[in-house]
Curated annotation (Swiss-Prot):
Keyword DNA-binding: no
Record's keyword terms, sorted: Hydrogen ion transport, Ion transport, Transport
GO terms for cellular component: contractile vacuolar membrane; endocytic vesicle; pathogen-containing vacuole; phagocytic vesicle; proton-transporting two-sector ATPase complex, catalytic domain
Family: Belongs to the V-ATPase E subunit family.
UniProt protein name: V-type proton ATPase subunit E
Keyword Nucleus on entry: no
Organism lineage string: Eukaryota, Amoebozoa, Evosea, Eumycetozoa, Dictyostelia
InterPro entries named among the record's database cross-references: ATPase_E_C, ATPase_V1_Esu
Purpose: Subunit of the peripheral V1 complex of vacuolar ATPase essential for assembly or catalytic function. V-ATPase is responsible for acidifying a variety of intracellular compartments in eukaryotic cells.
């Protein structure tokens, strides 16, 4: 084999090796491109999912915050409504108190009321010795009302009572426009067993009891029946 043939054969072998190398390089490049594309797709998908989750998380937080804000606004509105309603109820009480303060103006009618209040106290206390405390301005009416109540108690119950009107202690005076201290619209406080048992039977205390009992009715009159209430007395 001469040099020409040897060189030709070497060139052929070189070309074969180069072609094999090129094919291998192309194969590696193709595989690398495929892997890169696959990895890029995987990363993109993961990032996409991550972004979606972050968005959903933020969206949920926004929705939760919206609900919290709405709930706060509703609570504020409810409190405002309740405040207005309570103010209306207080106005009702004030009007009732104004009328209550005028009851003692009619002396005959007021004396009958005093007698009935004292008699009720006798029945409630059910004691043999009772002390009555009233307003200083009612002193004259109180003596007569106490005597009449004791007589009625003896007639109805069949027992005599040792009753006295306190001449040293008095209930607060009636309401006046130029007076801001404690007031009492009238009535009495009865006590027995040296003050250990007390029956508060003032007009003011009776108004409080009536108001507590009638508050549901007053609310209904002012605002209508509650849609959430299932039971009624």
């Amino acid at each position: 084999m001469d040099d020409t043939q040897v060189n030709a054969q070497l060139d052929q072998m070189k070309n074969f090796i180069l072609q094999e190398a090129q094919d291998k390089a192309n194969e590696i490049k193709t595989k690398a491109t495929q892997e890169f594309t696959s990895e890029k797709g995987r990363i993109f998908q993961n990032e996409k999912i991550k972004i979606i989750k972050e968005y959903e998380k933020k969206q949920k937080l926004i929705e939760v915050q919206k609900k919290i804000n709405l709930s706060n606004e509703l609570n504020k509105s409810r409190l405002s409504v309740l405040k207005v309603r309570e103010e209306c109820l207080r106005d009702v009480i004030k009007e009732a108190q104004k009328k209550l303060a005028t009851i003692s103006d009619d002396k005959d009618k007021y004396q009958t009321i005093l007698k009935n209040l004292i008699y009720q106290g006798f029945v409630k206390l059910n004691e043999n010795k009772i002390q009555v405390v009233g307003r200083k301005e009612d002193a004259g009416l109180l003596e007569k009302a106490t005597t009449e109540a004791a007589a009625q108690y003896k007639k109805n119950v069949g027992k005599s009572i040792d009753v006295s009107v306190d001449k040293e202690r008095f209930l607060p005076q009636g309401p006046k426009s130029d007076y801001n201290g404690p007031t009492c619209c009238g009535g009495v406080i009865l006590s027995a067993l040296e003050g250990r048992i007390i029956c508060k039977n003032t007009l003011d205390s009776r108004l409080e009891i009536c108001f507590d009992q009638l508050t549901p009715v007053i609310r209904t009159q002012l605002y209508g029946a509650s849609t959430s209430r299932k039971f009624f007395d």
